[in-house]
Amino acid sequence: MTTETFVKDVKPGLKNLSVLFIVLETGRVTKTKDGHEVRTCKVADKTGTINISVWDEVGNFIQPGDIIRLTKGYASLFKGCLTLYTGRGGDLQKIGEFCMVYSEVPNFSEPNPEYTAQQSQNKQAQAESGTGTNNHNSSSPAPPAPDLDNGNGSNSSGPSTNQSTAPAHSTSGRITRSQPNHSLPGAPNSVSNGKEPRRTGKR
C-alpha cells in the first residue's frame, strides 16, 4: 500500500504517488493534436497547492470542492512548472466534498527558477553528450534527460489555512480513466483565477 504524499513533498520525477486533495479550480479544456482533451485543475491540501493535468472525459466529472485521492500518480515539469499527472494504471477517486483543511500558499506549481535552471542544464548536457557519442559506435540514441529531484525551493512563510463549512456529503464515486503516461504541449501551465490565457500552437 502506498503512503499518502503531501503536496509540499511532491518533486519532479517522483512516481507512484498517492495524494489526497481538494479541487479549488478547474481549468478550460484544451485539445491536443491527436484529439485528447486536457484540463488543468488547481488542487490543495494542508501544505499548499499544485496543478494536476486531467485527461479526456475524467475532467468533465471533476468539480471545485471535490475531495479526490490520486493513486499511481507522477510529477513532472511542464513549461518549468511542477504538475501532477495520473500514471498508467492510476486513477482519481472522489471520496467526499467540501470539508477539508487546505492552504492556498505556497503554490508549488508557480514557475520555479531552480527547476528551470535544472532543465536547461539537463538539455545542455544532453546536447553535449549527443555530439560526443556521434564519434563512437552507439546502438541507440541517448535517452532524454530526466527531471532531477533537487528540492522545491519554495519559501512558505506562514501559510494560511482554510476550512469549508459546508456539510460533507456521503457521496463516494469512482472516476477511473487512465491517461497516456506522457505530457503533451498545449496544456495550460497554471490556473489562477479561473481565467486562463488562450493557448496557441507552437510558433
From Swiss-Prot:
Gene Ontology BP annotations: DNA damage response; DNA repair; double-strand break repair via homologous recombination; mitotic G2/M transition checkpoint; response to ionizing radiation
UniProt main location, coarse: nucleus
Record has Translocase as a keyword: no
Quaternary structure and interacting proteins, as annotated: Component of the SOSS complex, composed of soss-b (soss-b1/nabp2 or soss-b2/nabp1), soss-a/ints3 and soss-c/inip. SOSS complexes containing soss-b1/nabp2 are more abundant than complexes containing soss-b2/nabp1.
General function of this protein: Component of the SOSS complex, a multiprotein complex that functions downstream of the MRN complex to promote DNA repair and G2/M checkpoint. In the SOSS complex, acts as a sensor of single-stranded DNA that binds to single-stranded DNA. The SOSS complex associates with DNA lesions and influences diverse endpoints in the cellular DNA damage response including cell-cycle checkpoint activation, recombinational repair and maintenance of genomic stability. Required for efficient homologous recombination-dependent repair of double-strand breaks (DSBs).
Organism: Xenopus laevis
Feature: compositional bias, Low complexity: 129-140
Similarity comment: family membership: Belongs to the SOSS-B family. SOSS-B1 subfamily.
One Pfam family, short name: Ssb-like_OB
Name of the protein in its database record: SOSS complex subunit B1-B
Residue ranges: DNA binding: 22-92
